[in-house]
A protein has these predicted regions:
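Specific transmembrane alpha-helical segments of multi-pass solute transporters/efflux pumps
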Residues: 62-104, 146, 228-246
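C-terminal-most transmembrane helix of multi-pass membrane proteins
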Residues: 48, 148-150, 220, 256-309
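Transmembrane alpha-helices of multi-pass small-molecule transport proteins
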Residues: 36-88, 116-120, 172-179, 193-211, ...
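Hydrophobic/aromatic residues within transmembrane alpha-helices
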Residues: 31, 43, 47, 97, ...
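Glycine-/small-residue-enriched transmembrane alpha-helix faces in small-molecule transporters
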Residues: 1-45, 155-182, 202, 304-309
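Juxtamembrane helix-entry segments on the extracytoplasmic side of multipass membrane proteins
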Residues: 6-11, 36-41, 45, 71-76, ...
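Loop-to-transmembrane alpha-helix entry segments
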Residues: 110, 123-146, 156-162, 218-221, ...
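Helix-helix packing/entry segments at the starts of transmembrane helices
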Residues: 18, 46, 87, 91, ...
Length: 309
């Protein structure tokens, strides 16, 4: 039994981790505004490779045997797929959406990723969707519609390019969730994520080497460090440890702090003007995503009875 004080502490820390993810998008937006040489591609490459290296070094100190993982060919193929089809799009397309729009829009659009997971499981695994799942999905996509149009059928409030990158980022979020499901049961999530980031970063370097000179300004390196440390390394560690003390459904609900912090930050620091329909759309998406984690009380009791038998 986890002491209540410990559970409250890790619940608070998990909420702070979500805030960090949201705030990191603001640093990315600030970075892109400094110079056209600071592109989403460059930032993604730097973030993936440095963050991946740090996670692998940390996993080595924790005796999680990151090198030994590469001796299993199947594990390597899964991690490569996780990096290229999960970690790469969830970060690159997210940053591209931030560049052409803002951190708030990018974060909220990425929040519909779980609904693509739901659709995939319904089609491939014949998973029966609950009535709550269907209602939540309808609310989420209604929210995206309101956010994209301000509620006007003949008007797009955000550019089609921003919407395109945001939706691709959500698909990346779905792949990021689905691909490592089995491997993390056998291999440390830190090792899987670390190698996934390295493979994804190297693949981006092969596709588009970003070796041009970037502006040598203090704010460039400060913002880049913030994206890597505040947006990746610290929250990853917090979330990984929080799951030892807080139930996963609660941690998932705390993810709502990410779009909230990104939106508030965009309004305060980047002059984002939110129309009433924008707030309605944003709230619909976030609440709908949170609803997916709700389990009816009757179902919870059945699960508890099964575990006790």
């Amino acid at each position: 039994m986890v002491p209540a004080k410990t559970r409250r502490l890790w619940t608070f820390l998990a909420a702070m981790a979500a805030v960090m993810w949201g705030v990191s998008g603001l640093f990315a937006k600030g970075l892109f505004d400094i110079s056209p040489k600071l592109t989403p591609m460059w930032l993604t490459q730097v973030r993936l490779i440095i963050s991946g290296a740090v996670l692998l070094i940390a996993s080595g100190f924790l005796k999680q045997k990151p090198i030994a993982t590469l001796k299993n060919k199947h594990n390597v193929l899964v991690i490569i797929a996780y990096g290229i089809f999960g970690l790469l799009p969830v970060q690159l397309f997210y940053f591209m959406c931030i560049q052409v729009a803002n951190a708030s829009i990018a974060t909220i659009l990425q929040f519909i990723g779980p609904f693509f997971v739901l659709g995939y499981l319904a089609i491939t695994h014949k998973q029966v969707m609950r009535r709550l799942d269907i209602i939540a999905a309808l609310c989420a996509f209604l929210g995206v519609f309101l956010l994209s149009t301000h509620g006007q059928f003949n008007h797009l409030a955000i550019t089609p390019v921003a919407l395109f990158w945001g939706i691709l980022s959500a698909f990346g979020e779905a792949a990021y969730t689905l691909i490592p499901v089995n491997i993390v049961k056998k291999v440390s999530s830190m090792v899987v994520t670390g190698w996934g980031m390295i493979f994804a970063g190297i693949s981006l370097l092969i596709i588009d080497p970003q070796f041009h000179a970037v502006p040598n300004k203090p704010e460039v390196w400060l913002y880049t460090a913030a994206v890597i440390v505040i947006g990746t390394i610290i929250p990853f560690q917090i979330m990984a440890n929080a799951l030892r003390y807080v139930i996963p459904s609660t941690v998932s609900l705390l993810d709502a702090f990410e779009p909230f912090s990104a939106t508030v930050g965009s309004v305060l620091f980047f002059g984002l003007v939110m129309m009433p329909m924008d707030w309605v759309g944003s709230i619909l998406v976030v609440v709908a995503a949170m609803a997916l984690n709700l389990t009816p009380k009757q179902k919870k009791n059945k699960i508890k009875q099964k575990t006790e038998l």
